[in-house]
Amino acid sequence: MHKLTPDEAIDIAYDIFLEMAGEHLEPADILLFNLQFEERGAVEMVETSDRWEEEIGTLIDPTAFAEVWVGLVNDKDEMDDVFARFLISHQAENREYHVIWKE
């Protein structure tokens, strides 16, 4: 199985984020993201958490998925405002994904 590269995972997550953010985020969060993204925005692939089962109610194999966060970083370059967390399958022919949106 070909695993997604960080760039591929980031591109997929960001495309989904742009397409769906308007339906899932508060207008104030969308405005904040749009105003701050150029200066503080980040889309990062992180180590796949083993806690997704608690989030989505399905047991997953962390090695079969990439996890990507979309948000804003602080002055220490830490993502302190996460707008969406993505779990994206490495399988290209059956690209499954899950999103946890900021509440």
UniProtKB/Swiss-Prot annotation:
SUPFAM superfamilies per UniProt: Putative dsDNA mimic (SSF102816)
InterPro entries (alphabetical): dsDNA_mimic_put (IPR007376), Put_dsDNA_mimic_sf (IPR036763)
Organism of provenance: Haemophilus ducreyi (strain 35000HP / ATCC 700724)
Function comment: May act as a double-stranded DNA (dsDNA) mimic. Probably regulates the activity of a dsDNA-binding protein.
Superkingdom per UniProt: Bacteria
Family per record: Belongs to the putative dsDNA mimic protein family.
Classification lineage: Bacteria, Pseudomonadati, Pseudomonadota, Gammaproteobacteria, Pasteurellales
Pfam families (UniProt xref): DUF440
Chain segments annotated as coiled-coil in the UniProt record: none
Protein name as annotated: Putative double-stranded DNA mimic protein HD_0986
